[in-house]
Regions:
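Active-site helical microenvironments for divalent-metal-assisted chemistry
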Residues: 2-218
C-alpha cells in the first residue's frame, strides 16, 4: 500500500481471522447463501475494515459488493464474482497475496493479482497504464471484472461530485479530468479485448456525464 503505514495488532479468532469482520454489515442474501462467496465477503470485510472511499466517503466494502453485484446480475460465474469481492483486498486492503491464495485458491488469487496495481510506479498515469496492460494480458475474465470495477468507480466518483462538488479533487489527490482520462483509456482497452462487453453501454453513459461535469468547470 502507498504511503506511511503503522502496524497494529488486530484482534483475531482461533483461526487467525480478524474479529472486526464480524462487525461488518451482514452480506446480501445471495452472498450469504454461497459458502465460497460468504468466505470471500468475510475476507473483504476484514481487509477493508474501517476504510472509506475518497470519492464518495462510503465504506470501502460497499464498492467491492457493488462490483460483485454487477458481475452476479450480469450472469458471470462464481469465480468471477468471488474475485470481484476481493479485487482490492491486496492493493488497498490488508490481505496478503499469500493468505488470499491459501484461503481462496489459485484461480481467484491469480485474478485478484491481475487486478492489483504495481505500487512501485510513482506516476499516476504510468501506474494506471501498466495496470490496464496487465489486465489485458490476463485475459477476458480479468477484463470483465476490471470493467465492473470501472463502472463502480465512475458511479462512486459521480456520487462524490454530487456530494462534495469541487472538493472532490482534493479528496482524491488528482483531477476529475485525470480520472476521466484513465477511465476512457480503460474503456478503450475493455472494448478492444471484448467488443461486446455487457458493461460498455453503462460505461459510455457514465463517461459522458463526467465529460459534461469537466466541461462545465472550464
Amino acid at each position: 500500500m502507498r504511503g506511511l503505514s503503522v502496524s497494529l495488532a488486530r484482534p483475531t479468532d482461533e483461526f487467525g481471522h480478524d474479529r472486526r469482520a464480524s462487525e461488518a454489515p451482514a452480506p446480501p442474501t445471495w452472498i450469504a447463501q454461497s459458502p465460497v462467496l460468504a468466505r470471500a465477503y468475510r475476507l473483504a470485510a476484514s481487509a477493508h475494515a474501517s476504510q472509506r472511499r475518497a470519492t464518495d466517503g462510503a465504506p470501502f466494502l460497499d464498492h467491492v459488493v457493488e462490483v460483485a453485484t454487477l458481475l452476479e446480475e450480469a450472469g458471470f460465474d462464481e469465480e468471477s464474482v468471488t474475485a470481484g469481492l476481493l479485487h482490492d483486498a491486496v492493493e488497498r486492503g490488508t490481505l496478503t497475496a499469500e493468505r488470499l491464495r491459501r484461503e481462496m485458491g489459485d484461480a481467484v488469487s491469480s485474478l485478484v493479482l491481475a487486478l492489483t496495481e504495481d505500487d512501485s510506479i510513482d506516476s499516476f498515469a504510468e501506474r494506471k497504464a501498466a495496470l490496464r496492460e496487465q489486465v489485458r494480458q490476463s485475459g477476458p475474465q480479468a477484463v470483465t471484472i476490471f470493467a465492473a470495477d470501472k463502472l463502480s468507480d465512475i458511479n462512486g466518483l459521480r456520487r462524490g461530485i454530487a456530494r462534495f462538488g469541487d472538493e472532490i479533487e482534493q479528496r482524491m489527490g488528482t483531477t476529475v479530468g485525470g480520472m476521466a482520462s484513465h477511465y476512457r483509456a480503460s474503456v478503450e482497452m475493455i472494448e478492444a479485448s471484448m467488443p461486446r462487453s455487457v458493461f460498455s453501454p453503462a460505461l459510455h453513459a457514465q463517461l459522458e456525464e463526467l465529460d459534461r461535469y469537466a466541461a462545465a468547470r472550464h
